[in-house]
């Protein structure tokens, strides 16, 4: 039987019912969220900054509150725990269903801790979520900021990176001039708000670039890094590939740096208007890669929301 926190002491039934409810896009109550996040914290605090992951696994990029597209992702990729998943951050903000999206992923983590890995993205932060929608959504759905606080406190425990079979390094953003090797990542103190600068910030904010070397990022955080940097990093750490998310790519995935780096983006028709495909990357037992592209799930009536979020695409 799949070992899980939910199944210990007979608690799985309640959690399974909650997962079923969440799959129908119905949020949990505030006390249920609090209990769930307490259990999740116990699991996540035991995980490494470079969390080891075995194949087969399906690697996913940004979701951004596009709940119905996450359900479509599970329909196409296989449901958890039949398929192992690795999500590379940015569960919240921009889409209309950040609450349901992040609650479902955390519930799956608690129920099947060995089957799903959830990394931190730059949007899993107190500051960013106050600007881009998650904070306002929590206020609207729960009447107070309590659930926002519960989740943003939990985000501090999400692992920063994962390592699939010692050869695919997965993270939300990209590389850092402060980090040459994986041990430098392992030694970071991650349990904090995402800093404005430094190695932890860079891992969640940086982007690959056509220009060599390190560059100043137009995002105002992190760096751009060239093919020379990726090649050196992969060589030093015996890696085949860096897989990351963080950037909208129209086909859902995009190779860079002569296939040393791949961007995976899993929110189709991003912000309900970009017209992009989404994709997920399946890594099988033999470590072969297959990209699966998908289009948006059929649109539901979107909730009546006053949009006051800036248009700058983080």
UniProtKB/Swiss-Prot annotation:
Keywords: Cytoplasm, Hydrolase, Manganese, Metal-binding, Protein phosphatase. Its main location: cytoplasm. Its EC number is 3.1.3.16. InterPro entries: Calcineurin-like_PHP_ApaH, Metallo-depent_PP-like, PPA2-like, Ser/Thr-sp_prot-phosphatase. One of its GO terms (molecular function) is metal ion binding. CDD domains: MPP_PP2A_PP4_PP6 (cd07415). The keyword Metal-binding applies. It is found in: Cytoplasm. GO terms for biological process: mitotic cell cycle. The active site is at 123 (proton donor). Belongs to the PPP phosphatase family. PP-2A subfamily. This is Serine/threonine-protein phosphatase PP2A-4 catalytic subunit. It comes from Oryza sativa subsp. japonica.
